[in-house]
A protein has these predicted regions:
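Short, solvent-exposed loop/turn segments at conserved positions within beta-propeller repeat blades
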Residues: 62, 112-120, 162-163, 205-207, ...
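Structural signal for beta-propeller blades
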Residues: 64-67, 110-112, 123, 165-167, ...
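A short beta-strand motif characteristic of beta-propeller blades
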Residues: 32-38, 75-83, 132-139, 176-183, ...
Length: 324
């Protein structure tokens, strides 16, 4: 009899535990993130990236700090300090999960009214899990604007250089960056992505161009072509590849887009078009696109400089890929 009672108690406990687990899971789904807020002030994040487990990582132009929101968290906390790897002003960030590496664009941003600082542009790498500094790769003569990053299937790293319209390359195992492509079509090169065709796609933040660069069998840059977009792009910025021929794109004029490439054409579909504070970056977590608004006018507009820009956030936008 005692054994039967004990078995009954254990069964009831198991059912209760299962109910609690289901309740927790349901609560987690109900509490799905609608925004991720950076826990700081005046940081001016310009780029975001994410990992498959749902962590979201932010850079910081003004403070050089890298912030991280844990999976499911609606708050991004300081994670990597500028003293780690001698970070300066952070632009692009990219999570390379295959290499277990976070790639970071670090530049020195001139401050109006102050002496021109010595250039110190570099692509830096950190351990994606721990945040520990790994290595720094200087841009030629330490000059230029390292803006954003993409990684090819073979592990080659590509980074845009905005000031002179270039794409730099770091081959697997290489110790130095090299200029891979330079052309007037790449003027104001900003966002970058790699699609299944192996080509490199680059936009121009000032030109509105979306350019495809073929990769030759020896790895050198091949034919370069400006794609015909279904509508003009206005201040295109950060891009992320999310399918064989699909890119997510932030437009500084207030939109987050899906771009589907088909031959020489690119179909642009606006996912949301009412952002007020200059979207500069996107990242996909599950079926949600997080769109970062950088509020760069508070850095660049004399009328707004010194005013409080308020908190910086990435906003969730539901995403269903286009049928192709």
């Amino acid at each position: 009899m005692a054994r039967m009672k004990k078995a009954l108690v254990m069964a009831v406990a198991a059912v209760a535990a299962a109910g609690v687990a289901l309740a927790i899971a349901g609560g987690a789904l109900a509490a799905e993130r609608t925004q991720i807020t950076v826990k700081d002030s005046g940081e001016f994040p310009e780029s975001i990236t994410s990992t498959k487990d749902g962590a979201v990582i932010f850079g910081s132009i003004s403070k050089g700090i890298i912030y991280k929101a844990a999976p499911g968290s609606a708050t991004a906390e300081p994670w990597i300090q500028p003293s780690s790897g001698n970070l300066k002003n952070v632009l692009g960030v990219f999570a390379d999960e295959r290499a277990r590496t976070l790639w970071v664009c670090s530049i020195v941003r001139p401050v109006p009214g102050q002496p021109e600082p010595a250039p110190d542009t570099a692509l830096k790498s950190f351990n994606l899990k721990t945040g520990a500094f790994k290595k720094s790769y200087d841009f030629p003569d330490h000059k230029g604007t390292c803006n954003d990053i993409a990684v090819a299937k073979d592990g080659t790293i590509y980074a845009t250089e905005t000031a002179e319209g270039k794409v730099l390359r770091l081959k697997p195992g290489a110790s130095k960056l090299e200029v891979w492509a330079s052309d007037p079509l790449l003027a104001s090169a900003d966002g970058i992505a790699v699609l299944a065709d192996g080509a490199i796609y680059v936009n121009g933040v000032r030109t509105g161009n979306l350019v495809r660069i073929a990769v030759k069998p020896d790895g050198s840059a091949g034919t370069m072509m400006k794609l015909e977009t279904s509508r003009p792009l206005s201040r295109p910025d950060g891009m992320r590849s999310v399918g064989p021929n699909t890119i997510l794109l932030a437009e500084g004029e207030g939109r987050a887009d899906e771009v589907v490439v088909n031959g020489e054409k690119a179909e642009v579909r606006t996912l949301r078009g009412d952002f007020k504070d200059q979207p500069t970056a996107v990242t996909l977590v599950g079926k949600t696109v997080f769109v970062l608004e950088a509020k760069l006018n508070y850095l660049n507009d004399e009328k707004l400089k010194g005013q409080d820009p308020g908190p910086f956030r990435a906003t969730a936008v539901a995403y269903t890929p286009s049928k192709q």
